[in-house]
Regions:
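Core catalytic lobe of class I
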Residues: 1-249
Length: 249
């Protein structure tokens, strides 16, 4: 007897704030998503404790969610989390999405007895596997991000925060999307993040100023949010001498 397939459920999505609003060809807010289990789920052991973990069942996912690694389209995974009771339960979200740099990322797969050859009509060899797409049409990319940011908002706790990393290519339009979805009043900071030294080396010889930073956009779900002050202890104390009001030495 064939195994019964899980029934898809329609999960309603809340409307966006709506102002300010960015428009593009094919823009369509998500009204609902179809909830069904993500393709594969594993337990991640970041501390390398070597303890044995059993992959939790979907019906127990809400009570046993630590250190889970999902495989599959992130939109399907977010829909799975919504279906399994995580709406409004997530305190902190960080995403580092594709920047739409115009290049798809691939990895080489070693296959015994197979010579390297190009697949007809494709730009990849037979032993290269696409890791993720990073080459979208502009309108397609904005819709891609729009849908996923809407789902992330559904998962975020009312006192929760989200951090979205972007670079100069689409940082400005993504900021407008975040304003539309989370509300401009819930924007907290644009945090500047330095890039690696490897990027500096690849930028030599360009006839323009080097771009050596990314932006991390910090938004909250509401005005009543959790925030822990960030501070670093100085190795040596520094005394500021004030000579005139507003002037420092």
């Amino acid at each position: 007897m064939a195994k019964k397939q899980p029934r898809e459920q329609k999960i309603k999505i809340s409307p966006t704030k709506g102002r300010p609003m960015l428009n593009w060809v094919g823009k369509k807010p998500l009204d609902y998503v179809k909830g069904y289990p993500a393709v594969l789920m594993e337990v991640f052991d970041p501390l390398k404790t070597n303890l044995r973990y059993d992959v939790p069942k979907y019906e127990n996912l809400e009570k046993n969610w630590q250190n889970l690694l999902f495989y599959g389209d992130n939109k399907d995974v977010l829909a799975t989390l919504l279906e399994q009771g995580f709406r409004g339960k997530i305190d902190l979200i960080y995403i580092d999405p594709p920047f739409n740099v115009g290049i798809d990322y691939v990895r080489k797969v070693q296959l015994r007895g197979l010579k390297t050859s190009k697949i007809e009509g494709e730009g990849y060899s037979a032993i290269e596997q696409i890791m993720y797409f990073n080459n979208f049409l502009e309108d397609t990319y904005l819709q891609f991000m729009y849908e996923r940011l809407q789902l992330l908002k559904e998962l975020l706790n009312e006192r929760g925060s989200i951090f979205v990393r972007m670079d100069y290519r689409f940082g400005h339009p993504i900021k407008l999307l975040l304003d539309e979805i989370f509300g401009k009043e819930n924007f907290r900071n644009e945090i500047v993040v330095n890039r690696t030294q490897e990027f500096f080396k690849s930028s030599r010889g360009l006839k323009k100023l080097m771009v050596d930073t990314d932006s991390l956009f910090f938004y909250t779900k509401s005005n009543d949010y959790i925030f822990h002050e960030v501070s670093v202890k100085r190795e040596k104390e520094i005394w500021w001498e004030i000579t005139l009001p507003g002037e420092h030495k």
